[in-house]
Structure formats: structure tokens, C-alpha cells
Amino acid sequence: MPNWTKFDAEVIKKTHGDIFYYRDLYEGKHSEIFPRAKELIEKGEITDNIMYGTHRAKNVRTPYIVANLCKLIPEIPAMLVSRSIGNIQTSFSPDDFQAENINSDTDEIVDEPRDEVSKIINVQQEVIDQIQKNSHLALEHWGNILQQQLDGGLVGVPWLDEKGLRLEFKARDVYYPHDDGLGVDLAYEIEIDEQEYLHVYREQVVNGDLHTRHMLYLLNESRKTEEVPEDETKKLLGMNELEKVYPGRGRPFVIYWPNEKTFMNPLGISCLKGQDGKQDEINWTLTRNAITFERNGKPRIAISKEIMAALQERAQERYGDESKIDHRDLEITTYDDNGKAMEVIQIDITKIGDIQWVKDLMKLMLMETKTSEKVVDFYMENTSTSAQSGVAKFYDLFTSLIKAEQIQSEYIYFLQQLIESALWLANYNDPAVVIEEPEILLKSMIPISRKELIEENNMAYTSETQSLETTIRRNNPNASEEWIQEELARVEAEKTSNDSFSLMRGHQTIQQFMGNRDENGNPIQNNQDDE
């Protein structure tokens, strides 16, 4: 169990490594972390206007060039996975027994009219929907996955307070697990009345029950702590109780999601680990090329001494200054005795630097991080501009999709465990809420046309491998639950109804309905026999 006698950057680094370094790497603050860049900036050979402003660059023309591939590496799986997360549905169907248990506590959890709590029909789904609304979950998926990839881990915490039942997501550096594996501390640095405090939230399993506790420490200038008394802690944090016990809960509510967990790195590692050296070399090569181009890229004119003397003489006669050479005098010139005349010299900029070396480094970074080259549209000069089929696109993105599917399955498990913890909190106060791991619907990672989507799902429905409700949900992934239920009812109502007569003799035609008689009332069968 952590002993909070001091809290500073070293405490964070001891548990989580140098996560702030990887954040700077992602944000493109390379001129602050790479030694070669800092040295050139200090010498004045290059500048970084974004980091240091234009006042440092008034005598420098070459910028520090950053091709930030470290930004794409975590963003690509975040983009693929986040767009594939659909609605969250309960595994239970609404039943009368659960509806009868609705009470004022249920009404407090769900945003419904206060005077008619019985209007809540599907309690379980309403509670899950309320958790999503309170958590703004639809807006959190991309950031959650990105932060987990970047830091190497993500923390999820369920809360039930005056803000409602919700999920909160925290960066890795607040998470401090206990050595015995039976608890966890979350440490937040907060400021109250211009005074810095360390707020520690502890969850610990004792004899099969979960004990939670809030602690507050005063931080001095040397970052050492002094525990604040309980009465003052309640006042500063605005809480009536600092400790709670949840009988029967044998594991913490807090859920931690590591990235690429191993025995050597049980809390996970950043996806950018080991990529900083190659990123530095890419920036260095591009910046060195820029310096070379700045010095040698502009065209220069080479002329003989005789021509230069003639130009200076004309400038002296015309302007009184031999240095004011008129460019019009260069349009017509003469040859010297050796046939030499004016020459225009310009370096071939395509030969400057090692662009192929940069491409190889980028390719190596993508390979090590399991990122498809095509997903960043990198090698475009030799590719065809014709349209590709969905299968071709799939194989172009194959490596990234494999990585994204693994992240997707882990993220779904992470969300299910978090929602189960939130439902556990709700059930503790209200038995009408059932504890479960809900179903999370998935959408395609690769965008497909509306036509392809409908054809795929309709085919599954007609071949009886998919239900009507699932078909409607997948055809309308952004529709609300109310709309889906109404659409399902409309489709069911429009189906041809069956009765005992139709089941025995088949569905009636218009002629059968008219008693097998024509519009004049004559029997159709007799007329056919006469003929």
C-alpha cells in the first residue's frame, strides 16, 4: 500500500515511467526533447517558431522541420476503434417484475418526471442509457483509446453522486495499485483556496468486502505531505462521509486497462516506446536538407572577369555606383577569347539529402508499431488512382485492422467491467437495477456505402441468420432506442397476419375473397368448365 509522505514527478516516474516524455513526443514538442535540435536552436542555425516565437528567428531563415509520425501511430487505432463502437444494450428484456420494483431511488437515477415513476418501463435499459448520457460516452471513445495507447494505460472509475451515475476516465499517472493486488489508490493533485493538496481515493478489499476512503494531504514547497484531519477534509471536499463499505464486493470498482501488458511491464507500455530515436533522425535529416536547400537552392550566375568588369563600368556610368548592376545588361553578353560567357548555376534540389533514408525510417516505425503503410497514404507516387473494392481496401489495411481488433476487444471488456461496477453501485441503493455486463453493439471499422450496409444486413435477415431487430439496429446505427422500437413495431404490423383459415388453405387471393365469382357474380369455375 502506498505511503503518501511525498508526491512529485519522481513518484510518478517510479510507477509509470516517463509518460510525460511520450506526451511531448506525440504533441510535437521535439525541439525541447531532442538534443541535436536544442543545440542547433541555441546556436541560431535553426528555429522553432511554434515553441519559441518569431523573436528568436529574426536572423534565422531555416525552421526546425518536424514530420511527426509519432502523432499518427496512436491516432490510427483510435480512429478505427472509436468509430466501431455502437450503442450499449442490456442483456435482459423488460419484465413486469422489474417494473414493479421501480421506486423513488430509481427515479433519482433516471431523468424522468418525478410524479410518475411507473412510466419507466425498461428499467435496466433506462439506467444504462442514463450512464451513457451522464458520462458523455459517445464523445469519450476516441480520447480514451488515444490516451491508452500514448500513456500505456487508462483508468476508469464509476461514480454515484449529485452529478448522477456516470463513468469517469483518468490518465494513467493517477493510478497506484497495492502490492497485494487487493486495492488501489487514485492520487489527484488539486488546489483549494490557492493551496495545493493531494487528494487520495483508496479502494481496498478486506475480508471479502470493499472498503473505500477519501484522504487529503497538504503539500508544502518541497512536495512533502501532511495529512489533513477528517473534519477539515470533509469540509474542504464537501463530503458528509469519507469512508464506505460495500458488503460482498470482492474487487475494486476502479478498472485499469494496460496496453501490451507483459510480466516485465504489468501496467503496460506506450505505443511510442523505442520510436524516439527514429523520429529524431527523421526530423534531423529533413532539417539538414532544409539548411542545404536554403544555402544552395537559389540559382547563381557565373560570369568571366571581363564581363564583370564591363557590368561594373556600365553601372558606374549609369548610377555612379559600380555595385548597382542592372540585370538588363545580362540579357545580352559577349564571349571571351576562350568562348566563355555567362552561366546560370543551380543545384539539383532532388539530389539534396537522403529522402529515401527518411522513407525507410518511417516504414520501419510503421512496421514496429503494427501500422499499415496504406492507412497513412504514404507511398502514393506508384499507386493507381482507380477505385478499389472493399476487399482490396481490407488487405491494404490488414495490419492496422488486426491491431485495432485486439484493441477493440480489450476496450469492450474495459467498458463492460466499468458499467458493471456502475450498476453495482446503483444496485447497492436500488434493487430494481440488475447487475450485468451489457452488450456493446459494433459497427464496421472501414466505412462502407449505405447501399452495401443495407444489402449485407438484409441478406443476413432473409437467410435467417439475423433477427429483424438486429437488422434494423445495424441498418440504422445512429438511431435512438425509441426510434428502433417504433420502427420494429411498424415493420411487424405491416407483415401479413396469419389466421387458422389461411394456415390451412393458404393466403386468400382477391378471387377467393369474392367467392370465386367474377364481377357480375357468375361462378368462375363453371365458366371455365363450359369453355
Model regions and ranges:
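Extended, helix-rich architectural segments
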Residues: 1-183, 520-531
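Extended, regular secondary-structure scaffolds
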Residues: 145-151, 155-269
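Amphipathic alpha-helical protein-protein interaction segments
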Residues: 152-159, 466-474
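Short, basic interhelical loop/turn and adjoining N-cap
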Residues: 477-485
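Extended, compositionally biased alpha-helical segments that mediate assembly or anchoring
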Residues: 487-531
